[in-house]
Amino acid sequence: MELLKPLSDFFKAIENDYRISITHIGIYVALLQFRAGQGFVNPIQAYRYEIMDLAKIASPKTYYKCMRELNEYGYIIYKSTRKRNQGSTIFFVDQ
């Protein structure tokens, strides 16, 4: 059950947050899945296309918008790198 705690905490945190859409949820869950594949490290380093594939999102514009909003709303800390050879850094915030 401990593996589900970050997801459960996220759903509790967004319960009354009208700003969060299904796309935000999909991206956050994809980030958690990616993190699990990396050994639950915090922060993770990920390329946009890796998270977009997991979240089933086709538009980079949608991805960047939702990542920026998740950062602004305090659910993650997103440090974007515009370098092609380095993934962005994403910190998970304890809810």
Language-model features, listed with the residues they occupy:
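Winged helix-turn-helix DNA-binding recognition segment
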Residues: 35-93
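Short recognition helix of helix-turn-helix/winged-helix DNA-binding domains
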Residues: 1-54
